[in-house]
Amino acid sequence: MKQKTLTLTQLYREGAKCLGDAGIGDAALDAWYLLEYVTGISKAMYYADPDREISEKNVKRYETYIEERSRHIPLQHITGEQEFMGYSFYVNEHVLIPRQDTEVLVEEALKVIRPGMRILDMCTGSGCILFSILKMEKERYYVSNLEGMGVDISKESLAVA
């Protein structure tokens, strides 16, 4: 039995069509993001060699992720990661996905935080807000005596943080 081989272009087009048919708003972008996630191939590499064949293992992984995304599962829950304030955070279905809007909260907090303060992050979820504040404060002063604690009622969320 002959194995199914697909090129980058074929796989990407199939993924984008499937997501479009499922009503995903940014179908082409999401299909690209998942292709890059599975293969590790950048856009530059894609355009340099669009007919590169993809291993059967990666084809299956990509098709699985496309199927999940077509059921409107968020990309971040599929990949398990989300960038926030320049840092990559692990996320899953037990925490809210960090949003760019929330980065403003971190920026505003950094304006009023002073050395020696203690921070309590209630409903910490992924921990991205507290971690970002502590990390950025340390980068700003090279040394920081800030203390922080994240708490959450959800054991599953705390396992993520």
Where are these regions (language model features)?
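Conserved SAM/SAH cofactor-binding pocket of Class I
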Residues: 103-161
